[in-house]
Structures are given as C-alpha cells and as structure tokens.
C-alpha cells in the first residue's frame, strides 16, 4: 500500500516537473499536463487565435497537446522571427514526416543542410530553366490558350469550375520538372490533379493532426484506429504520388544526356551522378523524388486554388470584374492573349490579384516554423523546440497598414495615379529565410492564366447561389473556397 502511494507520488512529481512552464514565454494558455488545451473543432484555429489576441496581445503562447506554440500576430513580429536562423526549421510533425516516409527529405519540410542544399539547387535550376523569363511565359501562355478553348465547352450552364483549370496549372510544373504535359481532357492527368487535391485535403484532417500535437498518441493508438483517423488514406495517397514520380525518374534515367539537360529532373540526375562518390552528399533518388513531390504539392494546389478564389470574388463583386475586362480590352488587342509585357497597362488587374491574396490569406497561419535552439523575441524567451506560427491573416487585416482591412478593396494596391504599388505588409508567400521558392512562378501563372480567362469569359453566380467567402474550420493548413456553382459566358 505504502509502495503504491510512493510510486503514485513519484509519478505526480515527475509529471509536474516535466509539465512546468518554461520561464520567459509570452503570455497565453498552458493547459493540462500531456494534453495542454486543444482547439475547438467548430472554429478555425486562426479565428481562435484572434480571440486570444484580444486578451494576450500580439505574441501568444498556446500549448496544444505537448507542443509549445507561439503565435505572432503582427507584421513586425513575423518579419523579425522568420528572418532569424533560430526560427528557420520546420517542426517534426507526423503529417510532415509521412511525406518523407519518416525521413527529413525534400525542400518544404526539411531542415539544416538538406534544406539549404536543395533550396539553393532548385532556385539556381529554376532560374536557368526560365522562371520569370519569356521561355517559361511561353509555356504558361500555351496552357492558358488551351484552357480558354476548353472553357468554351462549358459555357451558359450552372456548374462547378472545370477541373481543367487545375490540370493547366499542373502542366506548367510538369514542363519545368519533366518536360511533359497532359491534354486538358487526359484522364490520367485529371486523376493526378485530383490525387494532389485529395492528398492535400487529407493532410488537413483534424483527427490526423492530433498526432502532430500529441505525439505520444502514436505509441498507444492501435493501427486500426490510426487508419480510421486518416493515416492509411494519407499514406496511400503519398505512395501513389511517389509511384508517379518513380515512373518519370526511370524514363529520365534511360534518356539522360548530361551535356543537354532539358528539365529539373535531368539537372538533379546529373548532379546525383557527379556526387555519387561524395559521402556527405544529400543527393539520392529518394531525395529527388521528395523534392519533385514538394514542387507539385506546393506549386499546383496553391495556384489553382487562388484562381478559384479570384473567380469567386469577381462573381461576388461583378463591378470589379467588369473594370478588369475594360482594362484588358484597352491594353490587349482581341485575338492576342495578354502577356507580361502588358503588366504596366493592367494595374487594376494586378492590384485585384494582390487584394485577393490579402483578403483570403490562403495559408492563414503560415507554414509552421520551429526553433532549433533557444532564442529571444520581443523580450520573451522561446526555448528550443517551440512551434512558431505566423498569423498572416492578422498581418493582412491590420488597420495600421490597410485602409479597409476587412473589405475587398483592390485600391489597397494602387497609388493616387492609379498605378500598381507593392505593399510590404502582404506576406502571402511568407518572408525571411524560408520565403516560397516558387513565388515568381506563381505570380507569373496567376497573371497569365487569369488575364486570359477574363479576356475571354465573364463569370456569374446562378440565380439563388450563395457565395461563401468564409474559412472552413476543418481545414488546418490551407483556406480552400467552399464548392460553388458558376455560369461561364463567352465574351463577344
């Protein structure tokens, strides 16, 4: 009896010591031992943090499960933190690790030498392959022209936006990665885009994300329960994506000409050959596959989703859509697709794209960062292993920086003469050391695709259709628009 009581007391003391809140953290919620304070499922996490901001201020601690999270709710804090080396890692989240089969590979979720090596390599190769240059613009314009022809088959009837939009965006990434494209009617291409969408969506599941914040659950949860929570579905999707990558890698290995690399995959395979005797090299087939998957995941779903958001807002604000079309008509001759050369003459259109980015905040809490050592921020101490979350929506709706923070107002990005102006406080591609490697490509795609679409079509809501622009509380990472119906009308 006494022994049992002593063991219980010892357990209580151990839990207390392990659960003790580190000194110097920002104010906020600590919660219970082992479980912290879990967020509500009925409200988006970003909205729950906004409520906490009213009580605790712009820098907030919230222990979710056993993870110490620090949320940053203004631009200066976000810029300062994400520029620090100490805050440049990604957390070892379970959902992140599933993409690398438990390994620290790729470029989006990796850290240290792995991340630095592949980020530099990708930026150099994409620059050489034409990111931001006319060579790549021609490929995007070809996809835009094909998309215009495809959309003509879907006019004058209520329907969801065609999936061919996703495939057109995907083809741009395929061109860069493997010098490949699908017809917009191709069943395999459409299946691949749907697989990307489904896998990204599955990654956001609330139940599955419990393992990110309660890692001890992995040790006690039976496999059948894990599968019910979404592990098998996500893992199967990742494996299927990897199988696609394997096929193209094998084809490129068979046709590789080291003197004439035609795409990113060739460049990787050549570099892999050159470093095969280097024991410190991070280049191997598994890593190449992971990096290519990162490019598809980050470069396809985000851009196609922003096209869908933009069309939704232009349906909701038809006067903005009409003004853009008048601007395009005045700058671009009919029968000629808009190009980057017309950018200076399409200031209102450019401003509208940026305003959709601002009002939507596609990744409301940014992609999680992680402290790789103890550091200080705004007078507070962030211990090693702290998850750092950037509340980009707070940055994008801060009345200190935006004239009409809660309204859709393209004039946020226009000066007094009606010319487009960049705003430093728009951080939709993040900021600091891990700013998105594909920012230039994404901006080019959005400009070319949307200008071509709006030059040729008008989008309106069917009678009685309610257009929802609020976030889905079940989505932990991205903010996808709710499904909507649209009527596409060809312009004369």
From Swiss-Prot:
Its cofactor is heme. The keyword Endoplasmic reticulum applies. Keywords: Endoplasmic reticulum, Heme, Iron, Membrane, Metal-binding, Microsome, Monooxygenase, Oxidoreductase. InterPro entries: Cyt_P450 (IPR001128), Cyt_P450_CS (IPR017972), Cyt_P450_E_grp-I (IPR002401), Cyt_P450_sf (IPR036396), Cytochrome_P450_fam2 (IPR050182). Gene3D superfamilies: Cytochrome P450. Pfam families: p450. It is a peripheral membrane protein. One of its GO terms (cellular component) is endoplasmic reticulum membrane. Its EC number is 1.14.14.1. Disulfide bonds: none annotated. It is found in: Endoplasmic reticulum membrane; Microsome membrane. Its main location: endoplasmic reticulum. Heme binds at residue 436. One of its GO terms (biological process) is xenobiotic metabolic process. GO terms for molecular function: heme binding; iron ion binding; oxidoreductase activity, acting on paired donors, with incorporation or reduction of molecular oxygen, reduced flavin or flavoprotein as one donor, and incorporation of one atom of oxygen; steroid hydroxylase activity. It catalyses: an organic molecule + reduced [NADPH--hemoprotein reductase] + O2 = an alcohol + oxidized [NADPH--hemoprotein reductase] + H2O + H(+). Belongs to the cytochrome P450 family. Efficient in catalyzing the monooxygenation of benzphetamine, aminopyrine, benzo(a)pyrene, progesterone, and testosterone. This is Cytochrome P450 2L1. The lineage of its organism: Eukaryota, Metazoa, Ecdysozoa, Arthropoda, Crustacea. The gene is CYP2L1.
């Amino acid at each position: 009896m006494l022994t049992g009581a002593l063991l219980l007391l010892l357990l209580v003391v151990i839990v207390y010591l392990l659960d003790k809140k580190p000194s110097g953290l920002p104010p906020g919620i600590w919660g219970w031992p082992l479980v912290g304070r879990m967020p509500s499922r009925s409200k988006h996490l970003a909205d729950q943090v906004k409520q906490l901001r009213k009580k605790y201020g712009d820098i907030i601690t919230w222990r979710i499960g056993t993870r110490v999270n620090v949320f940053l709710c203004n631009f200066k804090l976000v810029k300062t933190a994400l520029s620090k080396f100490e805050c440049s890692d990604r957390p070892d989240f379970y959902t992140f690790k599933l993409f690398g089969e438990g390994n620290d590979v790729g470029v989006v979720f990796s850290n240290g030498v792995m991340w630095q090596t592949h980020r530099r390599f990708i930026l150099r190769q994409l620059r050489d392959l034409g990111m931001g240059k006319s060579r790549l613009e021609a490929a995007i314009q070809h996809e835009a022209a094909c998309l215009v022809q495809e959309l003509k088959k879907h006019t004058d009837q209520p329907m969801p936006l065609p999936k061919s939009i996703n495939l057109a965006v995907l083809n741009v990434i395929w061109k860069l990665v493997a010098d490949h494209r699908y017809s917009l009617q191709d069943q395999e291409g459409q299946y691949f885009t749907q697989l990307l969408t489904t896998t990204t969506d599955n990654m956001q599941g609330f139940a599955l994300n419990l393992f990110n914040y309660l890692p001890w659950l992995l040790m006690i949860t039976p496999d059948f329960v894990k599968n019910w929570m979404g592990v098998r579905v996500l893992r199967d999707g990742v494996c299927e994506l990897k199988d696609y990558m394997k096929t193209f890698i094998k084809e490129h290995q068979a046709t590789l000409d080291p003197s004439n690399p035609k795409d990113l995959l060739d460049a990787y395979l050549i570099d892999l050959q050159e470093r095969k005797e280097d024991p410190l090299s991070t280049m191997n087939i598994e890593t190449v596959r992971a990096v290519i998957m990162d490019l598809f995941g980050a470069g396809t779903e985000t851009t196609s989703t922003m096209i869908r958001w933009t069309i939704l807002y232009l349906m909701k604000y038809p006067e903005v859509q009409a003004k853009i079309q008048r601007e395009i008509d005045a700058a671009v001759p009919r029968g000629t697709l808009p190009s980057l050369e017309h950018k200076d003459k399409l200031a209102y259109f450019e401003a509208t794209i940026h305003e959709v980015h601002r009002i939507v905040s596609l990744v409301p809490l940014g992609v999680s960062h992680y402290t790789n050592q103890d550091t200080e921020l705004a007078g507070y101490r962030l211990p090693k292993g702290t998850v750092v979350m950037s509340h980009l929506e707070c940055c994008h709706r801060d009345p200190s920086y935006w004239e009409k923070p809660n309204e859709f107002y393209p004039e946020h990005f226009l000066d007094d003469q009606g010319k487009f102006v960049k705003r430093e406080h728009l951080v939709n591609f993040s900021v600091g050391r891990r700013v998105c490697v594909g920012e230039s490509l994404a901006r080019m795609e959005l400009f070319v695709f949307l200008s071509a679409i709006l030059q040729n079509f008008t989008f309106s809501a069917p009678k009685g259709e309610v257009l929802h622009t609020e976030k889905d509380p079940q989505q932990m990472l991205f903010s996808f628009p709710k499904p909507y119906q649209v009527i596409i009308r060809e312009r004369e």
